[in-house]
């Protein structure tokens, strides 16, 4: 960023203050020209790393989910359709007999690895359900005795508010205790805890009865096994899905079959056991969600580029299911939200109508019924941020609604997981378009939970929820890229000194080069993009210094002189430059343009130096026009202002030359195409509008016009700055959404890798202007150090 506020902020940071040369530049001085190819850093091609990649690739074929003791026990209670005296699924009972823990519980492996004290309610519920199943059929008396002993010892956990409470626990667990009494099981339970538990059940049922909402009806149907004779099961069956299940829940479906003997319920249970063997998961089917979770994790951890073939296959399959209206997507809110977000961000044409209907059903509709938790609400919120079209007003409304719900969860302190709490706060503080890629990925890696699980009526895990191989590869890749970035920063430091830029008196910019490079490394980080990062960073610093000449320190003669020098190009700087300052600026600019142009020539197979010169001249002329307007007190129309201001925001020299260095060939026809210019204008307008909002008071005091002041003038001066800010922000929202739509457009003239750079810069400007006081000093210092200088060191390795 090049405007005053960024420069002033940077100049105050002790980290960025620089003398004649920094320690890095001093050690590198005189060592030759900056390197334009990626430094040689240890690659990720070792046999061990390749084996890790192979194991990750196999995750796409393992469509598995952890077995649920709780659900398996309920399926085990199902009687044979031919005889109520015999179990329909004896294999489930044998599985229970074989999987009791030494302490008498029926905990699963993830219960032990995931802070067991927080999952005791889940373990109690699973253990009691297993006891009921065995007792019903007169099996495993020794197992039952051990299980009862465990329940008696740990019963206090049933009312412990510090532990994670499974969905419906306060109704289902007491109901199972009643069922235990019916089966003549003698439980010696603490009477105080038991009374407390029963009171909670009564209060919860009373609340649900008085509420009477459709959402409550869905909730009670989902926990149907805990309602027993209180349920009108015929009414509950309206939630039955095409696969025969109720909510894709084996336990609810088993309870429904026990009550009604519905043949489709039995078909569903048979299909689940056919797929998983002797035990069932907590949710089935979950294939689409599981696959999308792998894709999402790979993208969030920064290693998706290693699995492009597998990811493409998942996305194609998901898109096909989306178009077919597959229940696995549209009957599960989390899956729908993740599918909508992933497909949209990967360029698939998915309308928001179906997604909006799922959101509405999830929170208010009586049909077909969706169960939700904070994870689901967060997933829906992230998906609802992806507004691309002007007509998506309802999507915007749902985004506001979901945001409000998450804020309530956050302020109410109801999120029991500290990690989830942090995720929600991050999502609310930083919208997806105001997050620098590398910052987000580092945070994801550092907070990645290899023992992650989800909890509805019971907890469950997927291979993609917490995977050591994903974490291992992402850490190695991050640290490798970071080592390359540190080497590039040293080269950048050397370039700064070799071009004598440290001699200029506006020394506040001697520090800005750290930020100029950081913005590139934090957005497009892959090793092969080294040339593009260096072009971005060098041109960013040059625009900052040129902007300072035009806006702060230069005379009109110096400004005109610099423009003339660039136009003439082949000049004798010792005689043609009006000042030492102009001589240094022009010499550095010329050398940088030639360096970037030469490297781009090698990649593109044609000369593009003249185009880079034109890009710079466009910027210089637009800056000169602003100076002349201010000098002559000329008041442009809004159209006149905009046509000049988006260029003068100075993103052209930063982004446009770098497009030639990201890989794809860019023909002259492409760079002259309207799509190319639309991408540039939309990106630049976002920065310009946000800058004008931030700089309104300062520029107003200086007698300078911007979009804010012109908007107020065009409305007769009758609207307040606050109203104008709302209008300009709305304008910016439209520009940003249109930019993202173009970037994601599949049929495009400009290659996707090039379009991504426009979006990366858009994210940079939105991050800087996300807070009312900007990207403040201490946070910037911390982030730069983390992303560039601090490797990830985790105790897992």
Swiss-Prot record:
Record keyword Transit peptide present: yes
Protein's pathway: Secondary metabolite biosynthesis; terpenoid biosynthesis
Residue numbers binding Mg(2+) 3: 691, 699
Region (Disordered), start-end ranges: 21-47
GO molecular function list: magnesium ion binding; terpene synthase activity
Major site of localization recorded for this protein: plastid
Subcellular location: Plastid, Chloroplast
This protein's encoding gene: KSL1
Family, per entry: Belongs to the terpene synthase family.
Protein name per the record: Ent-atiserene synthase KSL1, chloroplastic
Species: Isodon japonicus (Scutellaria japonica)
């Amino acid at each position: 960023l090049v405007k005053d506020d960024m420069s002033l902020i940077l100049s105050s940071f002790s980290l960025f203050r620089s003398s004649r040369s920094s320690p890095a530049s001093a050690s590198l001085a005189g060592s030759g020209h900056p390197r334009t190819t990626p430094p040689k850093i240890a690659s990720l091609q070792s046999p061990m790393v390749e084996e890790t990649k192979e194991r990750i690739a196999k995750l796409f074929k393992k469509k598995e989910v952890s077995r649920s003791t709780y659900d398996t026990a309920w399926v085990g209670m199902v009687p044979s359709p031919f005889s109520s005296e015999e179990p329909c699924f004896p294999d489930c009972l044998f599985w229970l007999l074989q999987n009791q823990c030494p302490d008498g519980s029926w905990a699963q492996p993830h219960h032990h690895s995931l802070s067991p004290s927080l999952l005791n309610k889940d373990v109690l519920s699973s253990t009691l359900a297993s006891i009921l199943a065995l007792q019903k059929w007169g099996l495993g008396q020794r197992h039952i005795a051990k299980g009862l002993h465990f329940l008696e010892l740990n019963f206090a956990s049933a009312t412990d508010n510090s532990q994670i409470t499974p969905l419906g626990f306060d109704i289902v667990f007491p109901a199972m205790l009643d069922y235990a009494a019916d089966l003549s099981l003698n439980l010696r339970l603490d009477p105080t805890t038991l009374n407390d538990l029963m009171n909670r059940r009564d209060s919860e049922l009373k609340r649900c009865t008085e509420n009477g909402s459709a959402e409550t009806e869905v909730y009670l149907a989902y926990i149907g096994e805990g309602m027993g004779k209180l349920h009108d099961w015929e009414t509950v069956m309206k939630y039955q899905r095409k696969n025969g299940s109720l909510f894709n829940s084996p336990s609810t479906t088993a309870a429904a079959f026990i009550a009604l003997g519905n043949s489709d319920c039995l078909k569903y249970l048979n299909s689940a056991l056919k797929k998983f063997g002797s035990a069932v998961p907590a949710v089935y089917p979950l294939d689409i969600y599981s696959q999308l979770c792998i894709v999402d994790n790979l993208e969030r951890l920064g290693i998706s580029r290693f699995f492009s073939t597998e990811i493409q296959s998942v996305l194609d399959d998901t898109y096909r299911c989306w178009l077919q209206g597959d229940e696995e997507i549209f009957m599960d809110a989390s899956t729908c939200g993740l599918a909508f977000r992933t497909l949209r961000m990967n360029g698939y044409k998915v309308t928001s109508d179906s997604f909006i209907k799922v959101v509405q059903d999830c929170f208010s509709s009586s049909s077909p019924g969706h169960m939700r938790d904070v994870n689901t609400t967060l997933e829906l919120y992230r998906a609802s941020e992806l507004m691309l079209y002007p007509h998506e007003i309802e999507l915007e409304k749902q985004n506001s609604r979901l945001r409000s719900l998450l804020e309530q969860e956050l302020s109410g302190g109801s999120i029991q997981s500290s990690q989830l709490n942090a995720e929600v706060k991050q999502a609310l503080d930083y919208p997806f378009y105001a997050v620098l890629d590398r910052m987000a990925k580092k945070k994801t890696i550092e907070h990645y939970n290899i023992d992650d699980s989800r909890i509805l009526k019971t907890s469950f895990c997927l291979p993609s929820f917490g995977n050591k191989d994903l974490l291992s590869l992402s850490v190695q890749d991050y640290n490798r890229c970071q080592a390359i970035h540190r080497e590039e920063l040293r080269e950048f430091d050397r370039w700064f000194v070799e071009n004598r830029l440290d001699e200029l008196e506006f020394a506040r910019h001697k520090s800005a080069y750290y930020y100029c490079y950081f913005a590139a490394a934090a957005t497009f980080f892959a090793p092969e993009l080294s040339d593009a990062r260096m072009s971005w960073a060098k041109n960013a610093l040059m625009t900052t210094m040129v902007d300072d000449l035009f806006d702060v320190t230069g005379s009109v003669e110096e400004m005109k002189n610099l423009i003339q020098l660039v136009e003439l190009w082949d000049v004798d700087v010792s005689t043609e430059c009006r000042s030492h300052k102009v001589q240094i600026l022009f010499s550095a600019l010329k050398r940088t343009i030639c360096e970037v142009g030469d490297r781009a020539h090698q990649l593109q197979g044609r000369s593009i130096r003249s185009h880079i010169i034109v890009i710079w001249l466009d910027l210089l002329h637009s800056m000169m026009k602003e100076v002349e307007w201010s000098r002559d007190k000329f008041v442009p129309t809004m159209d006149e202002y905009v046509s000049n201001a988006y260029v003068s925001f100075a993103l052209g020299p930063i982004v446009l030359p770098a497009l030639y260095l990201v890989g794809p060939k860019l023909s002259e026809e492409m760079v002259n195409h309207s799509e190319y210019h639309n991408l540039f204008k939309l990106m630049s307008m976002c920065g310009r509008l946000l800058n004008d909002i931030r700089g309104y008071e300062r520029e107003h005091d200086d007698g300078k016009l911007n979009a804010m002041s012109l908007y107020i003038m065009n409305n007769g001066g009758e609207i307040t700055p606050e109203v104008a800010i709302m209008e300009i922000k709305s304008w910016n929202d439209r520009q940003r959404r249109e930019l993202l739509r173009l970037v994601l457009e599949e049929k495009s003239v400009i290659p996707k890798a090039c379009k991504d750079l426009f979006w990366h810069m858009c994210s940079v400007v939105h991050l800087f202007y996300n807070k009312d006081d900007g990207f403040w000093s201490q946070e910037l210092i911390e982030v730069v150090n983390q992303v560039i200088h601090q490797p990830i060191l985790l105790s897992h390795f």
